[in-house]
């Protein structure tokens, strides 16, 4: 591994700065270690993010698929031999409860298509960097005042809700919303309740916008985009909604549903 956790954190900062140049409100969120990086950004830059969305926050690997002796791993990785050679291999069900989806994702992972599905194994050096990030975040978790959405599977196979989601809820300094899922494992953003996760995220973000921002977002949802140029393979009949329009419309509908 050629990067450390401060490099990971810096990449979040760079992406945030780039978005901030074009957006009125920026939310920061991530899955697993990405959730921990989101917390770190909120620590370093208080008040910049409008809200945090934490999916399957992983402060500790203690789900039901993790070996009971895994607490010895930090000591093992300090040895020169294992420190360079150890790789954490994911086990069935690979964070996914949906059988069909799991089969497709696993095939991509095993084919080496990391861009599409990630890896089946994590190098020990990466784990050591993650633990350093977690330690930094936990030391100053109460300093975070940013409104936070916490989404976690109640039966997470990788990181238990008790040691992770509930820990964040009980120690963070700002207001929180907690969503525990019944039909998902660790990969909550793609598993069986992904639509529930999407609706909760849209509703959370909508509630943190000002009236003026909501009006602008609703206006975007009503704006069509020009149809794509005609090709031999496709002849559009009418303008299609842009991705931004679809997101805006989804947020508006989610908020309306919450108000009923």
Regions found by a protein language model. Give the residues of each.
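Catalytic nucleophile-loop/oxyanion-hole region of alpha/beta-hydrolase
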Residues: 1-27
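Conserved alpha/beta-hydrolase "nucleophile elbow" surrounding the catalytic nucleophile
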Residues: 30-32, 153
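Alpha/beta-hydrolase-fold enzymes
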Residues: 33, 37, 44-123
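Active-site nucleophile elbow and catalytic-triad environment of alpha/beta-hydrolase enzymes
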Residues: 123-140
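Short beta-strand/loop motif that positions the catalytic acidic residue
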Residues: 144, 150-152, 156
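Catalytic histidine neighborhood in serine/cysteine hydrolases
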Residues: 169-187
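Catalytic active-site module of serine/aspartate enzymes centered on a nucleophile-bearing elbow/loop
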Residues: 182-237, 241-260
